[in-house]
């Protein structure tokens, strides 16, 4: 079974765990003893704001997976964390990508991997106020909102990918009728893993 380190908390990130399990993977939480050594991939979930630097422990976890050439998927804050780890910067506050309750659904333009998985114009959900400003070294944008906000990034030579939106909230049991089926994000992530 493909083991994914979900770098979060079980009580806060259950939707991510459910998506990984439904796609065929097993979830390992950071507090599990010896879990890090046995994992085949890393999922960085959404969460709070990033202020200039990543917490040291998070940066070390990312380094461990990147240096071993293992797949890494960042979602929302996780994508922002990857961008910062690779030396990129963030817009600290943008408007138009959050609403008081629930996700905001909007169109996007996709190329490359994002288009291959989701089509060229996928409807996606948003709930964030930080975003990529300058891309990190080796990263390229492959999806954008209508206002130019980067919605997905890939690394040119490493199995590293991030999405600003929330595929865990528009796939499998949480599939939405008003947005693209995001299950391919998780299937692709698990397909990149060699046991």
Where are the regions that the model predicts?
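N-terminal beta1-alpha1 cap of cysteine-dependent amidohydrolase-like domains
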Residues: 1-77, 83-91, 95-123, 129, ...
